Amino acid sequence: MPQKHSASHRAGSNMGSSAVTVRCPSLPDFGPTSSFKHRGPHELSETCSFSKKEKDPMLTCEHLETPRLGFPNPAVSPSPRKKSVSLRKEKEESPELCETPKLRRKKCTLRRRLDLTLTLLKGDSDSQSSSLESNISHSLSLEKRLRDSTSGFPKEDNFSPLVTSTVKTEDAISSSQNSRLHFSQHKTSTIDDSKDDCGLFEVECLSPIEGNDFKDSVTHFSDSGLSASDENTCPELLGSSGSQTTYGADVTTSVTPVSSLIAKIKFHGSQTLASSAEVRDSLSTPEDSGFCSLSWDKSEDFLSDQEGSFQELQKHRGTPTVGDLVRQPKHPGRLRRLPTLQEQGSQSETDDEMQVAHPSAGVRVGTASGVLESQQGSEEKSGDLTLSFKDLSNTPALQLVCELFMKSKRKRFEQADDQEFSEEREEGKIARLQHVLAGLIGKKMGIERLDILTELQYRNLKHILAMVLDSLTAESLYSAWNVSRNWRGIVAQDKRANRRRKLFIAQLKAKAQGAAVLRVQDAATRLRLLSRLALRSVQAQAQAPNGQNEQAPAQSPWGEVLTPVASSSLTHLRSKQEQYLKVARTLFTDEALKPCPRCQSPAKYQPHKKRGLCSRLACGFDFCVLCLCAYHGSEDCRRGSAKGRGSRDVLPGSAQSKRNLKRL
């Protein structure tokens, strides 16, 4: 671990204790290059110390040294400025201080520092620019000033390096790769949620359609590339001036000025790339950025939860194929991470890397779409050639296959010598073809007429047939029986439909013989009273067919077998009943039927007039209902019985009815 040394030294007993505060002059912004060359994620520590023993606490910014990077003298810390801040107002500090943050919760921008470390280890001192050398010389002059300012102290004249690196030269590459692996397994964020101007690109920059701002950003960063492997190292520093990290819950404030780093320092790769296409192919987005689905260079296996080193990234890098372009990612959750990050205002540091455009991606997409369109065009042409047969309107599936089959069969017959062997082989293929086409859906589309009931019976769908037959009337069932043998068998299988059909046939036979079932309004109650001989003449009875009288022996209404004489009287009785029924159909609402006193034929009478008229033309007797004599009008009836009958008809509530009630 790096050791911390304070710039404040105590004098001996002769001198009083005093805190020496070294104020550094304002240097040009110097990025975190030399201070993080060999520092891994486990070697970072906080170098900001507060002198609490003094009356006024001061914030002392210490200098870090890394002597094993090929530099003659140690370099100065990336934050040469120093400010006095109180402990109370440290959370509100402006983002001009560059301090080394703590390792807790990955608050520092490790990704960029690790990229710089790997690049400096692989590169030589000759690959550095003149601006870097001027900055190093400036830092050396600063160190000399510090030594001169502290030379007056008697205790310590020589200053040792404040921070030393514990990483050896031979272990530098492996430790940096381990640091990359450890960093890739965590999520980092350099976006301040409290500020709106974060310098992030809009959503359109992440879409395949390039906007105006996106093209400008591509032009601005076209001279640099991102180091993705050890072979093609082209480090690129992408960032905005407003990128910073602020944590209100902690005391430590981590601010990383990136704009000055981009302005003053430029790194060149150790190997010259062949073309700009190789640079674009070498660009890749880490998995922890949440934009893995936008990269064209990653295969489906790399989209899984595989977290490896950058050597594994190089294995997966290559020219994508059409299958890879069409292939969709396995994990849709990573696709949903993009809008979530932009809504919350926190994105990974690799969002800056997404600002570099992939111009070759559009070419690749266009090429892939051209290949797919050519394939579809060839398929459509072949389909047109295949479907260019005639007479396919009836059965599109069957006739097409049969036509193709017969065409190949004729060719084989012409070439083959043994026709019998070929016929047997073709018969086997026909059987297999029929078995395949048996379950084909839509094989009979286009046919004008289709026997639906037969198709349902062929598929053994009896429940559907039962529903269809139940919805038909008895007459429709009788007609369906006479259509074909298949429909006759379908109706015969359904017992309920067959029973309805037989009943309908019986009714047709009864109508054909002229025997219609006639019923009166009150016949339902009188049919149960066959034993009442007094009302036998007026009971409504159904007429039996004429042909049945000669064949079957006649029976009385109560079930007794009648002799020929009795049967003749029964026939006379049935004729009387028929006459009553005919006259009853012509009655008005205020009329009733009564047998004529002379001929016992049905006669109409009116109860309020006490008058009846025989309906038989030969009789035509007009009689009084009370005395059954000829109608006498308003005169009293001649018989005494009429008087007695009149006395019986006592009006309710009259004096006679009251006397009768008293007598009772």
From Swiss-Prot:
Keywords: Meiosis, Metal-binding, Phosphoprotein, Ubl conjugation, Ubl conjugation pathway, Zinc, Zinc-finger. Phosphorylated on Thr-190 and Ser-289 in response to calcium, which is a prerequisite for ubiquitination and proteasomal degradation. Ubiquitinated in response to calcium, which promotes proteasomal degradation. One of its GO terms (biological process) is meiotic nuclear division. GO terms for cellular component: female germ cell nucleus; nucleus. Residues 328-337 have a biased composition (Basic residues). Residues 41-66, 87-98 have a biased composition (Basic and acidic residues). A zinc finger (ZBR-type) spans 592-640. Residues 1-98, 315-358, 637-664 are annotated as: Disordered. Pathway: Protein modification; protein ubiquitination. InterPro entries: FBX5_43, IBR_dom, ZF_ZBR. Residues 445-502 form the F-box domain. The keyword Phosphoprotein applies. SUPFAM superfamilies: RING/U-box (SSF57850). Zn(2+) 1 binds at C596, C599, C614, C619. One of its GO terms (molecular function) is zinc ion binding. Part of a SCF (SKP1-cullin-F-box) protein ligase complex. Interaction with SKP1 does not occur. Interacts with ANAPC2; the interaction is direct, ANAPC4, CDC16, CDC23; the interaction is direct; ANAPC10; the interaction is direct and CDC26, during spermatogenesis. Interacts with CDC20. Required to establish and maintain the arrest of oocytes at the second meiotic metaphase until fertilization. Acts by inhibiting the anaphase-promoting complex/cyclosome (APC/C) ubiquitin ligase. Probably recognizes and binds to some phosphorylated proteins and promotes their ubiquitination and degradation. Plays a vital role in modulating the ubiquitilation of CCNB1 and CDK1 during gametogenesis. This is F-box only protein 43. It comes from Rattus norvegicus. The lineage of its organism: Eukaryota, Metazoa, Chordata, Craniata, Vertebrata. The gene is Fbxo43.
